[in-house]
């Protein structure tokens, strides 16, 4: 097996290399959704707004170029029951280039309904303005 060591990679004409099929996250957030919401870590989030039980709004520092960006959602909670996190918030608001809403709710439990998870994770992919 060979090992390649390099400080700089350039095209054959000496210019920068074009990276193709790159899809780095343009936004992410890890926050505590219980009590007073608190951001643990983030990229490109200006503010997090608690809109009510299980309902949150993410405002971006730099807008996305259009509303065709992709979002991934996740959560972790110590209680029983399955918790789902979806886009749109409780009022099913459409995302804009500058913000999106999410909602968390519990299924398959005697406490079914909107819920504030202890850990909420959101990642966004797309072009920025």
Regions found by a protein language model. Give the residues of each.
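Extracellular jelly-roll beta-sandwich "head" domains, especially the C-terminal globular C1q domain
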Residues: 75-129
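Short, surface-exposed, low-complexity cationic segments
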Residues: 63-76
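Extracellular receptor-binding modules and their adjoining Ser/Thr/Gly/Asp/Asn-rich linkers
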Residues: 2-66, 106-108, 112-129
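Intrinsically disordered, low-complexity segments enriched in Ser/Pro/Gly/Ala and basic residues
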Residues: 1, 11, 20, 79, ...
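Generic preference for hydrophobic/aromatic residues in regular secondary structure cores
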Residues: 4, 9, 45, 71-72, ...
């Amino acid at each position: 097996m060979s090992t390649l060591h390099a400080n700089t990679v350039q095209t054959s004409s000496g210019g920068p290399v074009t990276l193709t099929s790159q899809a780095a996250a343009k936004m992410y957030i890890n926050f505590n959704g219980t009590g007073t919401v608190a951001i643990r870590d983030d990229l490109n989030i200006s503010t997090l707004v608690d809109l009510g039980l299980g309902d949150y709004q993410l405002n971006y520092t730099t807008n996305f170029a259009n509303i065709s960006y992709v979002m991934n959602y996740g959560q972790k909670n110590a209680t029983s029951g399955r918790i789902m996190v979806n886009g749109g918030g409780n009022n099913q608001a459409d995302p804009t280039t500058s913000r999106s809403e999410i909602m968390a709710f519990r299924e398959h439990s005697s406490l079914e309904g909107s819920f504030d998870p202890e850990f909420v994770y959101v990642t966004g992919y797309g072009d920025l303005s």
